[in-house]
Every structure is written in C-alpha cells, then in structure tokens.
Amino acid sequence: MAAAQRPPVGVEEALTRIATVADAPASTQAAQALWRMPLDAPVIVHDRASGSSWRRDSATGPALPVVLRNDQPPANTCITIDGAPAVLLLLPLPGDRDGLATLFWHEQWHCVQAALGLPATEGDTAHLDGEAGRTALRLEMRALAQALSTRDEHQARQHAAAALGYRALRSDAAAPPTRALEEEAKVERNEGLAEYSGRAIAAATHGGDATAAAVDALAKADASQSFVRSAAYVTGPAYGLLLDRWSPAWRRGLSAGATLPALLADALGVTWRGAGIAQNGAGYGADEVRTEERERAKERERRSAGYRERFLGNDAIRLPLRNPSISFDPRSLFPLDDAGTVYTPLTVRDEWGELTAVSGGLLSRDWALLSVSGGVVDGAGSRWTGPGWTIVLREGWRLERGGDGWGLTKEWGSGVGDPGDAGE
C-alpha cells in the first residue's frame, strides 16, 4: 500500500485554525441568523510554495490532497468541487483571528449567494479611478465613517444623508450617470455584501459588533491608490451596518437588483439623489481631498503613458483568451480607458497554459486579449520568461516571434485541440 501523501509544513496548523473559526458556536449562530441558512461549505487550503491543495474530512482527521481543475487558479474564493461549493483559502492565512474569521465568512457567503437569489456579478467601475469619481467617493466614505461612529442620532442621519449625496454627485459626473450607479451596485451586491457578512459574523464571535472595524477600514481606504473594484469592500459593510441600525429587516427579500444606498435612503426617508449634501464638504476635509486628487490625476497621466508604452507598444506580447480563469488583487486595478484594465499582480489560465505576471498585465475590457511587456524574452519549450512574467505552456502550444512580434501558435498535429476533438 502506498504511503499517504504528507502535507507541507503549515497546512495542518492552518486547517486547525480554520476549524476553530468555523466551529465557534457564536459565529455559526450569527451566520444562520444573518441570512437564515447555514454557511458551512467545506474548506480547502492552497499552499502556494508547493502548488498543492488540502482539505479535511473532519475537524480532527488527516489532511487530504485535493486536485484543482485547470480553470480554478488559486485564490481566496468559492469554487465547485465534485458538484458542490467549497471555500478555497490561500496560505498563509491572516495572522489575527478576526482577520481570518472575516475572510472565512466572506468566502462562505459567496458559496450561498446564488441560493439567496444574489448571483455573482461584476461591475465596470472604472469611473472610480478618475479625479471626480475618487473625490466624491472619498468624501462619501468619510461621511459614512462619521455616520457609523457618532452617538448622536440626528447627526448620524445627517452624515448618512451626506454620504448618499456624494454617491449621487459622483454618479452625476459619470457618463451616463445611471449606469455608474448600476455598475457600483453590482460590485456592492457581490463583494460588499460578502465583506459585510464576514465582518458581522467575525464580530459576533467575541460578542461585539463590526462598527469599529468598519470605521477603521474606511479610514485606511481613504489613502488607497485604487478604488476600481476594492471600494465595495469598505462601502458594503458601512451601508449594511447602517441598515442594521435603521432598517433591521433589510436583508429579507433582498433582490438581485437592490442597491444598498437606495435602501438606506428609504430607511432615512430621503430622496436619495437629492439627499442633503453639505455642498462645501468642510466637515469631511473636502478642500484637502480635492487638492490631493488633482495631484494624483497628474501622476495618473504619467502612469497611463507608461502602461500604454509597455502593453500597447509594438513589442508587447499579446495572448488570446477564450475561456480564462483569472486571479488578481482587487486593490491594484488601473483602468486604461478603452484599452482595458491593468491588473498587478495577475495570474491567468486558459487553453494554452498559465501566465503569472508579478509586474502586471493588460486585460481587454471583454477579457478576450491579454498583453504583457515585451523586451527581453527567454525560454524554450513550455516555459518562457519576460519582464515580470512567466508563461508555462500546455502541450501543443508554442511561443514564437514573427514579423508582428511574439505570439502563440498551436501545433495542430499534436492532437491537442485538433478539429474534431470532442474535448472533456
């Protein structure tokens, strides 16, 4: 009989820490109460150093290896294994208990969101990287922080109404304004509700509430260099906690088209697009924010020119995408107008293999084309490297340089993807 495969150092400890979070009675009760269904998908951990994944059948059982599909790049996410949802977490885990609990319950929510009638959606929030969008968002977040932290009921409502006003102001500056609201709402329903759930359930573990953590997250986000997809991670919990305060039943019957700001406006009894915004924003440091964002806009133009040279120049390497699986850091996205978005770092898997770009790559808006920096390219056979990236090709694919630069070619005689191949 073959010896059982042993996990890398740290895997057993990680699974034990996760079990402690998952089995805490206060947390499981809070999860059930929050969404009226259990959040108990099995958990898989992925060790990036060895490239291996592991799970346990029980809290005390041995770690067992798991093989991820080619279209499941390692990421903190919810995946499907044997037809059922499972939480996938990357090692190393967050070092603190609250951080781990927030991440764990965030991903658990993703595993039930479809059952809640809230399917995963992606929103195009590139307007959050422009000067006007960032300015209004930062002022909205500052107003949300004050609404959460003040004990005076009247003042809290005023700050909440101001936050809604800044959301309306930001959407009015976008083109078209209604689309901006809809796109932001998509991300808030997806990542915002997941992060709200993670923070609320994590706080319940020690009998507290998530307000202090939400306010701290808003303060840290104020200095963020990219809000394109990450803003919902802080605005979602803030709106959720304010709704808990003024409309406790808001989660019941939550629809796939719901927007958290509109729900809050209803709870406050205000017309949300005409909410009572303090025009000068003095209480939120508006002059300071506007000055900082004007300077950032100038720096953004310089970065944009550099990215265009790297990813749109003649020596850039362009890789076609047909059915990509992509993992990235949502805090570091850089929209490049109609050309797409720069993701740093980035891992992409497709039919031709896997690319890892620690220095980033440009994805077209329809995710049909990936571009990475050209320049000095080295390699042979299946493994190639370039400035800040590595490609590992599947059998039957080659990276070659032609008259138009580097590109991928398929060897039809290899039997991989030949015409008539029925596939998997």
Show where each model-derived region lies.
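N-terminal mature-domain "stem" immediately C-terminal to a signal peptide or N-terminal signal-anchor/transmembrane
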Residues: 4-65, 86, 94, 342-345, ...
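Non-catalytic terminal regions of proteins
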Residues: 20, 233, 252-424
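Post-HExxH zinc-binding segment in Zn-dependent metallohydrolases
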Residues: 46-51, 115-176, 180-211
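Catalytic zinc-binding patch centered on the HExxH motif and its immediate surroundings
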Residues: 61-83
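Short pre-active-site segment immediately N-terminal to the catalytic Zn-binding motif
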Residues: 89-104
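Short, flexible loop/turn elements at secondary-structure junctions
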Residues: 93-95, 109, 117
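Active-site recognition of the HExxH zinc-binding catalytic motif
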Residues: 102-115, 195
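Active-site-proximal alpha-helical
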Residues: 178-210, 215-278
